[in-house]
């Protein structure tokens, strides 16, 4: 069957992105708007927000064959084992029906020792999904959670229209590389994607690898994005970048929450503290690549801070959980829709004994499944009837 019908790629077909940039090749999904990107000078966040975690094409069609032309950008770390290609996953009526990868594209080579980067342009690739059921159906193509992807062209063997919006509530989540999906098996295997699917909500994933840092421009982006439930997972990046001390942390959390509440005054909002991570439980940052492990061809991390500096204000995960619990308790006196969740309820010490973090920092696929299953219970508690859209931000 030949996919000969070309459908223009527009925002009506894309979910989970805050903005689509028109490039020389096609559409580049962004998870932060242009105004926020203009205020950011950190290449790590620029990389993370342009990786389309949680972004998917959502179509209604009878098509049995779907082709998507993409221009992927591959990351290569000099001296480290090669990274697997990003995965595109196709779902039919919510069920997995195909996987594909772009085997080539632009390449960015990163020198971990110096931070220097080198870019090589590459070709557009065509992803083909065939033998889909010949009936009207909802088709989603989830883009790789960890690979910058430009959408170039969409072809099918039957007409396509945008999938109906439906009345599923929108869950907006913000967090670190763990929320972004680091080391998950694929884009539907990140814990936020799993939790959303299990609880029947629409995901907007603002998990940014290395970049959940209480940035005011991120708070403004959340403020201005419609959502029926907001969850903010705060802590691990602030510790492993050694970004701030206790004195700055509390006011920064208050400011972030104040900004989000300007647009969502009564939206259910849950602050989630860090998962259990032995490296930083009681040892401050910064965290760094373990060069001995790299020399053996393994990727691992270590904490470089000194626990003796905690009384002087250095942050650890233990301190951050205490602070977040205190702040949410204080604020909830005037904010009945604000809650606190200890991240160790999602992944705690006993989980770590059974499913350790392979590189000391990031969960693998099995651990993403465990966290996602547990978080689905949190979402079901918020939306016991499968939810009802309320919209927001407030006019």
Predicted region positions:
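Serine-esterase "nucleophile elbow" of acetyl-processing enzymes
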Residues: 132-133, 139-226
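Catalytic His-Asp segment of secreted/periplasmic serine-dependent ester chemistry enzymes
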Residues: 278-395
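Oxyanion-hole/transition-state-stabilizing segment in secreted/luminal serine hydrolases
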Residues: 195, 214-262, 270, 274-284, ...
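Short hydrophobic segments within beta-strands
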Residues: 68, 174-175, 272
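N-terminal secretory targeting modules
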Residues: 1-170, 291, 380-395
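Loop/turn elements at helix/coil->beta-strand transitions in domains of secreted/extracellular proteins
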Residues: 200-202, 226-229, 264-269, 335-338
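A general structural detector for well-ordered alpha-helical segments in enzyme core domains, enriched
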Residues: 191, 249-256, 320-327
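Acidic/histidine-rich helix-loop elements
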Residues: 205-212, 240, 360-363
């Amino acid at each position: 069957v030949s996919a000969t019908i070309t459908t223009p790629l527009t925002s009506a077909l894309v979910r989970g992105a805050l903005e689509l940039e028109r490039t020389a090749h096609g559409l580049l999904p962004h998870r932060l708007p242009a105004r926020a990107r203009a205020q950011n000078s950190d290449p790590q966040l620029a990389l993370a927000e342009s990786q389309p975690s949680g972004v998917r094409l959502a179509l209604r069609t009878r098509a049995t064959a779907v082709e998507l032309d993409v221009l992927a950008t591959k990351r290569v770390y000099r001296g480290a084992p090669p990274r697997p290609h990003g995965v595109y996953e196709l779902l039919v009526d919510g069920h997995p029906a195909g996987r594909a990868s772009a085997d080539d594209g632009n390449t960015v080579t990163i020198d971990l020792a110096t931070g220097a980067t080198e870019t090589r342009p590459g070709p557009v690739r065509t992803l083909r999904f065939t033998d889909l059921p010949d009936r009207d159906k909802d088709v989603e193509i989830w883009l790789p959670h960890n690979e910058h992807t430009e959408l170039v062209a969409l072809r099918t063997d039957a007409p396509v229209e945008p999938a109906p919006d439906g009345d599923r509530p929108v869950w907006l989540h913000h967090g670190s590389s763990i929320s972004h999906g680091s080391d998950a098996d694929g884009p539907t295997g990140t814990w936020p994607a799993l939790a959303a699917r299990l609880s029947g909500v629409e995901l907007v994933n603002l998990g940014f690898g290395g970049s959940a840092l209480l940035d005011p421009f991120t708070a403004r982006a959340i403020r201005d994005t419609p959502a029926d439930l907001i969850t903010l997972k705060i802590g691990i990046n602030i510790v492993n970048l050694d970004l701030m001390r206790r004195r700055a942390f509390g006011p920064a959390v208050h400011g972030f929450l104040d900004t989000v509440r300007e647009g969502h005054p009564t939206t259910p909002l849950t602050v989630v503290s860090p998962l259990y991570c032995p490296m930083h439980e009681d040892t401050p940052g910064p965290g760094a690549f373990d060069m001995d492990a790299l020399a053996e061809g393994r990727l691992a991390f270590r904490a470089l801070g000194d626990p003796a500096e905690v009384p002087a204000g250095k942050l650890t995960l233990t301190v951050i959980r205490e602070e977040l619990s205190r702040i949410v308790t204080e604020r909830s006196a005037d904010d009945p829709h604000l809650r606190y969740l200890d991240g160790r309820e999602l992944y705690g010490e006993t989980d770590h004994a059974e499913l350790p973090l392979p590189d000391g920092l990031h969960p693998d696929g099995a651990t993403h499944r465990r966290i996602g299953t547990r978080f689905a219970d949190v979402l079901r508690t918020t939306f016991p009837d499968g939810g009802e859209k309320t919209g927001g931000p407030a006019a």
